[in-house]
Regions:
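A recurrent flexible, glycine/aromatic-enriched loop bordering the glycosyltransferase active site
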Residues: 3-22, 40, 74
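Short glycine- and hydrophobic/aromatic-rich loop-to-beta-strand nucleating segment
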Residues: 13-27, 45, 57, 65
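Short helix-loop capping/hinge motifs at secondary-structure junctions, enriched
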Residues: 28-29, 98
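Structured helix-beta-strand junction loops
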Residues: 30, 53-54
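Active-site donor/metal-binding and catalytic loop motifs
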Residues: 35-36, 56-78, 87-91
Length: 158
């Protein structure tokens, strides 16, 4: 699948990554209750996707980022993996045009990839397998619940 980041020309996109420039009015109008989560991800998508539904978002490959802090979180940890799953669920549940079926297919693939990494590391594979299967079951149940997506995040990520 094509990523706008690979474009050599100015192009429209549905969302922009975190290293983006925004009109001050968009940034000032952004409302999201602070969530005291230990790990947060997808803020760029959660912020920019709704704007992209109403306004034209452009990617300009001529604009270059000079410096970006390195991510310090252990992306292989269970906490980070669970956070990514719940934030993806939040995004899908807050954007009804998103497909739950595609979300599940993605979740299955990500879960299998996590298990493959765990198996290759040969450390705690069975406890990891139990963890991700339990997490997947929770994600499925929450997907069909009428629970408020923000409340799901608050309960699962604090």
């Amino acid at each position: 699948k094509f990523s706008y980041l690979d474009s050599k020309e100015l192009c429209r996109t549905e969302w922009l990554n975190g290293a983006s420039l925004w009109r001050a009015s968009f940034a000032k109008s952004y409302k999201f209750e602070f969530l005291d989560a230990r790990y947060s991800i997808y803020e760029d998508l959660i912020f920019s996707y709704p704007i992209g539904k109403l306004h034209c978002l452009l990617f300009d490959p001529a604009i270059k980022l000079r410096f970006q802090h390195e991510i310090t979180a252990d992306v292989s940890s269970r906490m980070v993996f669970a956070s990514k799953c719940y934030w993806r669920l939040y995004f899908v549940k807050t954007n009804p045009e998103m497909s739950l079926l595609r979300f599940f297919w993605t979740q299955i693939g990500i879960t299998l990839q996590h298990l493959e990494i765990s198996y290759k590391l040969k450390s705690g594979f069975f406890s990891d397998a139990f963890f991700v299967l339990k997490l997947f079951a929770d994600i499925v149940i929450l997907s069909f619940s009428r629970a408020n997506p923000l409340e799901i995040l608050e309960k699962r990520l604090k």
